[in-house]
Amino acid sequence: KFTLDLALTAPDPLVAASNGVLVGVDVLSGARKRYRWSTSYPLSTYLVCFSATNYNTWSVNYNTLAGGTMPVLFYIYPEHDTPANRAAWEQVVPMLTTLRTLFGEYPFINEKYGIYECQFGGGMEHQTFTAQGTFDLGVTVHELGHQWWGDLVTCKTWNDIWLNEGFATYTEALWAEFKPGSSGLPALKSAMAGKKYFGAGTVYVQNAELGNLYAIFDGNTTYNKAGWVVHMLRHVLGDAAFFDMLAAYRATYAFSAAATAD
C-alpha cells in the first residue's frame, strides 16, 4: 500500500475528484482548473480512483466518536439531482453511525467519505470515495462496509476476495439488524434469507479460476455464500466473541492485507 498525491486538470465547468482530501484548486489559463487531492492513509492500487464531469456537489457532516466532524461529500449527475436521490445517498450518515458501533470508528476519519455517480449500475469501494451508479441503500451500505473490509483490511490475493465481499455482504445484514427502528433479529433473518445459495463452488477462488473475472466476483459464492460463512462464524462464536474477533482482525491487519489462513 502507498499514499497518493494526485493532480487532475479539467476544463470548466467540470469538477474533478479523487481519494483523500482536496488540498487545493489552482486556476489555470484556458478556462481550466487543477484539483489537487492527497491521501494520508495508505491504500491499495486497485482502490485509486478519479472522476471528472459536470457534477453537482454537496456535503453533509458526520459527527465522529471523538466529538468532531468529518465531511461526507456527494457528486451527482445534474439530471439525477433530485431530493429523493439526495436523501437516499445521505442515509450513509446514519449508516456510518451504526457501523461504528459494530466495527469501530470509520477508518479514514481524518479525510472524508464520499460517493460519486458513475455509469455502471453497481458500486466500487474506492478508499474514501465510492463510485455508485445507483441510489439503492443495499449497495450504499455494502460499499461503505468495504471501507473496513476491503480497504482498511484488504484481501492478500484474489483467491481471498471472499474476505472483502463476504464481510461487506454481511454488513448489509448487520445494517438491517441494527439500523434505527429495526425489528432486530427478524430483520437479520430476512436479510440473510435473500442471500441463500445451495449450489456448488467454494468461497475461496481456486487458482485455475483466477483468469475468470466472473469466478472471482461471483454473486453466489464470493458474495452470498461468503456472507453466510461470516454469519455462521457469528453463530458459532456468539455475539461477544464474534465482535471481539472483528476488532482483533482489524487491529492485526489494518492498512495491510490478510489471507484466508489468517
Task: Label each PLM-derived region with a short phrase.
Residues 191-231, 237:
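Conserved glycine-rich, hydrophobic/aromatic-active-site segments
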Residues 68-71, 119, 138, 142-145, ...:
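Active-site-adjacent bridging/hinge elements
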Residues 78-87, 128-130, 157-158, 214-219, ...:
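Second-shell loop/turn segments in exported
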Residues 219-262:
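Amphipathic alpha-helical substructures
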Residues 1, 79-80, 153-154, 208-216, ...:
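Flexible glycine/proline-enriched surface loops and loop-helix/loop-strand junctions
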